[in-house]
A protein has these predicted regions:
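RNA pseudouridine synthases
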Residues: 1-131
Length: 133
């Protein structure tokens, strides 16, 4: 596991694609607990299992509370870099409704509002384009 930073409150590590963000067997918290030799690693934000990237983890209940509050209050910003095929446009904001598919146990785009549906917003900017990518 590539550890970018660690102190007594937080650990910052690179989550590889295919590894869960959550505290499941083989997930990032379990892997970091083993690597750091610490009993407490808590997830405060998530990346989809197929997504790789930098994640911040709390190393105590107090740090988890503070960081989770920052995520909830939108003081925590995630930035993604991606390579796509085709031309999505220069820059846009895409808005969708996200719900949970109980059969496949995954998040899906919902067609209409509902009790378990929440809005999602993605702002993107094309940084470069080459050979259809």
């Amino acid at each position: 596991m590539e550890l970018l930073y660690a102190d007594k409150r937080i650990a910052v590590a690179v989550k590889p694609p295919g590894i869960l963000s959550t505290d499941e067997p083989g997930g990032m918290p379990e892997l970091l607990r083993r690597q750091l030799g610490t009993p407490c690693i808590r997830t405060v934000h998530r990346l989809d299992a197929a997504t790789g990237g930098v994640m911040v983890f709390a190393r105590s209940a107090a740090a988890a509370s503070i960081l989770s509050g920052q995520v909830r209050d939108h003081q925590f910003r995630k930035t993604y870099l991606a390579v796509v095929r085709g031309d999505p446009g220069q820059s846009e904001t895409w808005r969708d409704l996200l719900g949970r598919d109980p059969v496949r146990r995954r998040t899906v785009v919902a067609q209409e509002p509902g009790p378990d549906v929440r809005p999602a917003e993605l702002d993107f900017e094309r940084l470069a384009s080459r050979d259809g990518l």
